[in-house]
Regions:
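Conserved hydrophobic/aromatic beta-strand scaffold that supports enzyme active sites
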Residues: 30, 39-43, 61, 77, ...
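Ligand-binding loop in jelly-roll beta-barrel domains
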Residues: 70, 90-117
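Glycine- and acidic-residue-biased ligand/ion/polar-headgroup-sensing regions
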Residues: 57-69, 74
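A hydrophobic/aromatic-rich effector-binding and dimerization subdomain
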Residues: 6, 108-129
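Conserved short histidine dyad/triad with adjacent acidic residue
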Residues: 24-25, 40-55
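Short beta-strand segments in beta-sandwich/barrel cores
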Residues: 48-50, 67-72, 86
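A short, N-terminal "cap"/entry segment at the start of jelly-roll beta-barrel domains
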Residues: 1-38, 124-151
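Short acidic-glycine-tyrosine-enriched beta hairpin
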Residues: 11, 75-93
């Protein structure tokens, strides 16, 4: 990892090495990476989601820039709109859903970085992002996917 030694500006259209990942149908563009934190710009097309999961070693944050993103906290849904910040402390179950019918744009970050960057590289590189393959790879990278909620 290359860390900046001072203040820095990362342009709106910039991504680390021009990277653009497809993660479960969303588009992620990594913005900043260090041992202490990792941030990425995300676009959630309508009807895409990140299933309920836990980061046992990371705090995760999402700042909504455009659209409406639903946080499922393991018990109930919370609608986040532009300007809202979602905070998911390490060890807390959460899933993120775009049920709005329009794209959602947001900025994510985690602290510390852990192995999340490497997980995204692995998922993006899959020939087919099947649930079983993603869950297995995630387990190797400090992310635990949870069973679907009971109906």
């Amino acid at each position: 990892m290359t860390e900046s030694t001072g203040p820095d500006l990362i342009a709106a259209d910039a991504a680390i090495d021009g990277i653009e990942w497809n993660i479960l149908g969303q588009i992620y563009r990594p913005k900043q990476l260090s041992e202490r934190s990792f941030s990425w710009h995300a676009t959630f097309p309508p009807d895409t989601f990140v299933p309920p999961h836990v980061h046992p070693t990371q705090d995760e944050y999402v700042y909504v820039l455009d659209g409406e993103l639903t946080l499922f906290d393991g018990e109930s849904d919370h609608a986040a709109r532009p300007g809202d910040l979602l905070r998911m402390p390490m060890g807390s179950p959460h899933g993120l859903f775009n049920r709005s019918g329009a794209p959602v744009v947001c900025l994510f970050w985690v602290t510390p970085t852990g192995r999340l960057y490497d997980l995204f590289v692995g998922i993006d590189g899959m020939a087919e992002q099947t649930p079983d393959a993603v869950v297995a790879l995630a387990a190797e990278h400090e992310v635990e996917f949870l069973p679907p909620p009971e109906s």
